[in-house]
């Protein structure tokens, strides 16, 4: 696939997917560097979140549409490789949080809501943050987005309970 010229790939309808696959190694390295550059802030957010209460911290991975799949991938891995004595890792779609918060959120559980969002403008992503903020007594937010100008990043910029990572 990588040996075909762009016109051949376009004719096959494979030019975009091939380009995305080809850029993955570089993007993973970029993402690792973003993590390293923000490690102190991430560690501080996790320490603050753990200090919110006794017992395990509920870590909810959420997103809308394809961004929801990130949490579906992270949570099972972290349940296996992460510290499950300190953290309860759960993937929950934004639409589930918005439509039935009592089914997915516990008001008394200290929570870290990790939101994945490409644009940071999807109504359900923004609503999930607001619903969680109103419903959960002790909550912190980690926003991972591609868009510094998106509402998710902009609206949490001055929030001491939020950290936004731009990838």
Regions found by a protein language model. Give the residues of each.
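Cofactor-/ligand-binding subdomain signature composed of acidic, glycine-rich
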Residues: 1-44, 48-53
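Glycine-rich phosphate-binding loops that contact phosphosugars or nucleotide phosphates
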Residues: 53-167
């Amino acid at each position: 696939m990588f040996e075909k010229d762009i016109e051949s790939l376009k004719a096959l309808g494979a030019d975009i997917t091939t380009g995305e696959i080809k850029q993955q190694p570089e993007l993973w390295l970029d993402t690792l560097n973003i993590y390293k550059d923000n490690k102190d802030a991430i560690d501080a957010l996790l320490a603050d979140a753990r200090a919110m209460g006794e017992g395990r911290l509920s870590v909810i991975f959420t997103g809308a549409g394809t961004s929801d799949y990130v949490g579906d991938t992270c949570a099972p891995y972290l349940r296996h490789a992460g510290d499950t004595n300190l953290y309860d890792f759960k993937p929950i779609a934004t639409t589930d949080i918005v439509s039935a918060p009592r089914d997915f959120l516990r008001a008394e559980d200290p929570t870290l809501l990790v939101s994945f969002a490409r644009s940071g403008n999807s109504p359900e992503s923004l609503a999930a943050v607001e619903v969680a903020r109103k419903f959960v007594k002790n909550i912190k937010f980690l926003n991972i987005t591609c868009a510094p100008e998106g509402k998710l990043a902009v609206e949490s910029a001055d929030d001491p309970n939020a950290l936004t990572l731009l990838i």
